[in-house]
Amino acid sequence: MSVAKKFAWGCLAVVLLLFGSAYMGWRWVSANLAPTLGAENIAEMQQLLIDIDIPSDFTPTFAMYTDENQQDALLIYIQEDKRTVLSQLILHQQSTQFSKEEAENRMGNSFPGLQITRLEFHDAEPVSFTVPVSFQEQPVSVNYEEGRASEEAELSHVYSAFFEYRGQYMSIMLAGDPKFLNRGQFEQLLKSIK
């Protein structure tokens, strides 16, 4: 066999290996980390996450696990009007304690919701306050931010709370248009947790 034929067969083998490994990698990601948009999966995840009263105008739209062991659940609800997203509610459970920045990094830049929870430009200093809740003695600490995800983006309000719940760590973020979002809504969400 000539050198040219050996080289051609070698190139073909490398290309086939690349395609094969890419396919196997894609299958692994889709099996372990892909969004579970089916209604049954979202309902199942709602039961696993937290016992909370979600307002009826919020629709569950995105569910997935953010780790390969399928233990850290993420669920995103949107409130929309005529196909315009007014606000998003993000419930995120993890087995270890984490911050807002870590939660955003864990979700990844490609997942929905981050464009309004990760504010690059703040119009005011972030504010903290506490909300008394029924599931524990201590009130839950809440952070409130007002700003924009980018210079061209609309003004967004972001409320976030991180707390321990039934042996897991929970993050609840409510973000969106300030005309449709207020502190009372977020307080009501936290107070509804059982």
Pin down the residues of each PLM region.
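Conserved polar/disulfide-associated segments of primarily extracytoplasmic proteins
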Residues: 28-36, 65-171, 184
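N-terminal targeting sequences that direct proteins away from the cytosol to non-cytosolic compartments
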Residues: 2-83, 113, 165-166, 173-194
